[in-house]
């Protein structure tokens, strides 16, 4: 497999109007991806969705121009969640799906995620092939004047996704009597998420639903959940739901304002699906970041926890290869392959709401599935330095080895570079919270010194 340099763990990402997030590079990515995925004799189609970032107005037409120039028709969806783009790629029998988003990042960033005709994210090999096409020139792949593609907008895409998500909620159940705070992060779900919950009968308190192009994820959404938690308590709500900018991840909070992460959601859904006889694969797929408490809980339930590298695409790849139908990340990506091909925050929230309705107990009881071990994650910014070189630094290596020795088999230590930002992430967990904090602090200090 050729080495990827443009694509990270979740597509291409960077600062808007700076390489690689320029109109020129977006056009060339469209040409290369269109050439790669343009298979068969039928009329070729690509669907393009986006979140609410200002730079989407620049990248959307650039990508469309690239696809049109290699003979592909373009269907423009406008602001719509990432899982909706994956769903519509399959529904419209498109050759390719594109989501313009930088997910949970601030508005200054943007990115490009690519989906194949089956609705799954492209493989590492396919992304490497696209990079090779970019490097080797695209002149020979342009369509002739009469073979250019066309572009049109799909007017009812929001309604299609709303009905699709609602179809995953058990028939006969309604959300009447539940008061739900939904934080859409001023992002891609600002129209569809409140609509789904309202149509299922809930009383909704929407926040983060007034995007202006620059406020996506700003002090709101799944990474900044304080406002949601405070609003739940103030409004006397039964549950809070916070999505990120492209709505492929979710975190919740109970009626007391306590935050509930993806590990608890995996535990709840996995246990319930096991009892219902619908869980496949004998367990759940998660990443190396998931809490050891989740692993112990699943073991007590007679279920396995399969771990993958960080990134929902790797979770999905393992699920497909080994026959699992539930996986996700602590950050709130929850993948349920019975319903979809990628993480879907809104769909995951409905699984939890279904449990609330069925059990008729407060969220604080239903969502307290297991007790997590003390876990601490810190990010060290290393802009301008190669994270791999820093991690290979002898002083850093000694600090990591010393940390592992101090945990002495009673916990886990994980140090890795981010696939989407110039960060090194340091995570430790164990029974002794004070020791965990010391280990993380010492390693971060050495990394900061090495990156100066």
From Swiss-Prot:
Catalysis: reaction(s): alpha-D-glucosamine 1-phosphate = D-glucosamine 6-phosphate
Gene3D superfamilies: Alpha-D-Glucose-1,6-Bisphosphate, subunit A, domain 3, Alpha-D-phosphohexomutase, C-terminal domain
Cofactor note: Binds 1 Mg(2+) ion per subunit.
Keywords: Isomerase, Magnesium, Metal-binding, Phosphoprotein
Active site positions: 103 (phosphoserine intermediate)
UniProt-listed Enzyme Commission number(s): 5.4.2.10
Binding site for Mg(2+): 103, 244, 246, 248
Broad EC category: isomerase
Gene Ontology MF terms in the entry: magnesium ion binding; phosphoglucosamine mutase activity; phosphomannomutase activity
CC terms in the record's Gene Ontology section: cytosol
Modification Phosphoserine occurs at: 103
GO terms of biological process kind: carbohydrate metabolic process; peptidoglycan biosynthetic process; UDP-N-acetylglucosamine biosynthetic process
A Pfam family recorded for this sequence: PGM_PMM_I
Cofactor(s) required, per the database record: Mg(2+)
Mod. after translation: Activated by phosphorylation.
Known role: Catalyzes the conversion of glucosamine-6-phosphate to glucosamine-1-phosphate.
PANTHER family named among the record's database cross-references: PHOSPHOGLUCOMUTASE (ALPHA-D-GLUCOSE-1,6-BISPHOSPHATE-DEPENDENT), PHOSPHOHEXOSE MUTASE
Protein family membership: Belongs to the phosphohexose mutase family.
Name of protein: Phosphoglucosamine mutase
Organism expressing this protein natively: Rhodospirillum rubrum (strain ATCC 11170 / ATH 1.1.1 / DSM 467 / LMG 4362 / NCIMB 8255 / S1)
